[in-house]
Every structure is written in C-alpha cells, then in structure tokens.
C-alpha cells in the first residue's frame, strides 16, 4: 500500500481540500482533454447566453421604438386629420368674404353669389363623403331622423312630411340627424 510508505508527517498533511483535488484531478490525458472540452463547452454556452440576452434587449428596445413611433403617428393623425377638409373650406370662406366686400351689389347678385358658394360647399362635402339627409316623403328612420312633432297629413302614417333642418352623414355615419315633422 502506498499509504504505508509515507511518513506520518506526510499522512498528517492531508487535508480535505487536497484529497478533493486529488480525487478530481484527471488521472489520464484523456480525462484532462474531457475537462478542457467541458470548459470549452461552458464558455461556448455562456457566449450563446450573452448573445441571446443581447438579442432580447435589442428586441425589447425595438418594440419600445415601434410603440413610440406608432403613438407619434396617431398624435399626428389626430392633429392633422382635418387639414385637407379645412383647406377646402377656405375657398368657401373666401367666397363669402368676397360677397361681403362687394360695394354696390344688387339682391340678384347676392343671390347668385350665395348659390355659387353653396355649390362650392356641396362640392367639398361630396369630396369628403358628407351626404345630405333630406327625407321628405320617406318613412321615419330614428337612426337618421329626429322627430320634432307629428302633424295631420294625407301622407301615410309615420312618413316624414316636413324637414325643419337637413341632416348629414359622413361615410354612412350620422353626423347630425334631420329634424323632421312626421305624419300621424
């Protein structure tokens, strides 16, 4: 036995750490290579982990950037949604201002100017899908009409007989219902 050849001092110098080192120490060069390949594998996996963590951080940052840009785009869309419509209405306003600045106009010229301005406004409405609701003679529709009252009429019951104020829709959505009188 090998332990018997050692002096008592050498045997006493054994500590649990040295015993553990001796037990874990590779006995052959193959085991030493395997230990090296394990270290290499650990280093490789740590590198992959760091790479994946960086990719996750990049993806998070990219997601935040997309959310921020989308919020900015929504804010701009809200802010400038009426820009085209507003610019089209400016021509109508200009026509009204021109009519008011005419010095010696006749009633007929005012009427002609108002008719032209109304045509301009109607063209703007058509361009932006604003449709007039003028339901005289139609069945009363509570989704598009607001009944102000009922009147005796020769028309069929529940039929619109008079429009007090026209209504309007925007892309088939009611902006303002028509104010109507309905037959009893």
UniProtKB/Swiss-Prot annotation:
It comes from the Bacteria. One of its GO terms (biological process) is protein folding. It comes from Methylobacillus flagellatus (strain ATCC 51484 / DSM 6875 / VKM B-1610 / KT). Belongs to the GrpE family. Homodimer. The keyword Chaperone applies. Residues 1-39 are annotated as: Disordered. NCBIfam families: PRK14139.1 (NF010737), PRK14140.1 (NF010738), PRK14150.1 (NF010748). Gene3D superfamilies: 3.90.20.20, Head domain of nucleotide exchange factor GrpE. GO terms for molecular function: adenyl-nucleotide exchange factor activity; protein homodimerization activity; protein-folding chaperone binding; unfolded protein binding. Residues 1-17 have a biased composition (Basic and acidic residues). Participates actively in the response to hyperosmotic and heat shock by preventing the aggregation of stress-denatured proteins, in association with DnaK and GrpE. It is the nucleotide exchange factor for DnaK and may function as a thermosensor. Unfolded proteins bind initially to DnaJ; upon interaction with the DnaJ-bound protein, DnaK hydrolyzes its bound ATP, resulting in the formation of a stable complex. GrpE releases ADP from DnaK; ATP binding to DnaK triggers the release of the substrate protein, thus completing the reaction cycle. InterPro entries: GrpE, GrpE_coiled_coil, GrpE_head. Residues 18-27 have a biased composition (Polar residues). This is Protein GrpE. It is found in: Cytoplasm. Pfam families: GrpE. HAMAP family: GrpE. One of its GO terms (cellular component) is cytosol. PANTHER family: GRPE PROTEIN, GRPE PROTEIN HOMOLOG, MITOCHONDRIAL. The gene is grpE. Keywords: Chaperone, Cytoplasm, Stress response.
